[in-house]
């Protein structure tokens, strides 16, 4: 697959997220430095300008390469950074409340949310505008369905891998997470879209 293909960035974004997810779930804070380095790569790749520039550089067309160099000179878009930061902060705040409320328990005796989980939220937020951008084109009820299945399912996997404990029991906690994520994923997808593009959203896709 060529670097000039949009699919390259979509698959790379998804692969880095999976690598970050597994490393943080399995090794927690021991994998934090590695996961933060991966997150830095994600923050670069989520910028549409840099993606377009890299695609242009590898297109083999002189005009496209000149256009790519011009895009690089414009620098990093803070809109893109905020489109990752704000959804991540929303997710961190929500998990922190669930932790304080006794829904989640972690190995650390601290009532603060573990750093590895905060980093994981950064990784997830970085997928909203790239490998999960297709959610934007779905009706809200379908976004809610994907949130209920994928979001709650991710927490269930973390529970099964003993990254988190559920003091309230598996059935009650999983039901609560299904409800939360059926509302949360549409909200986060909308926030990411509005923060990055404002009223000038792309008609389809993630570029």
For every predicted segment, state its role.
Residues 1-61, 65, 72-207:
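Aromatic-rich, lipid-facing transmembrane alpha helices and their immediate juxtamembrane interface loops
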């Amino acid at each position: 697959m060529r670097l000039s293909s949009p699919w390259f960035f979509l698959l790379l974004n998804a692969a880095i997220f999976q690598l970050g997810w597994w490393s943080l779930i399995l090794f927690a804070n021991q994998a934090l430095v590695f996961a933060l380095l991966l997150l830095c790569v994600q923050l670069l790749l989520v910028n549409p300008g840099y993606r377009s520039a890299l695609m242009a550089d590898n297109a083999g067309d002189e005009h496209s390469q000149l256009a790519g160099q011009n895009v690089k000179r414009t620098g990093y878009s803070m809109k893109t950074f905020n489109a990752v930061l704000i959804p991540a902060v929303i997710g961190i705040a929500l998990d922190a409340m669930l932790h304080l409320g006794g829904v989640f328990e972690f190995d650390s005796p601290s009532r603060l949310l573990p750093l590895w989980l905060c980093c994981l939220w950064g990784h997830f937020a970085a997928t909203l505008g790239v490998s999960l951008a297709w959610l934007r084109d779905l009706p809200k009820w379908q976004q809610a369905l994907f949130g209920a299945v994928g979001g709650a399912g991710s927490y269930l996997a973390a529970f099964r891998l003993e990254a988190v404990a559920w003091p309230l029991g598996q059935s009650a906690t999983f039901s609560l997470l299904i409800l939360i994520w059926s509302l949360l994923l549409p909200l986060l997808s909308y926030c990411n879209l509005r923060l990055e593009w404002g009223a000038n959203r792309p008609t389809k896709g993630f570029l």
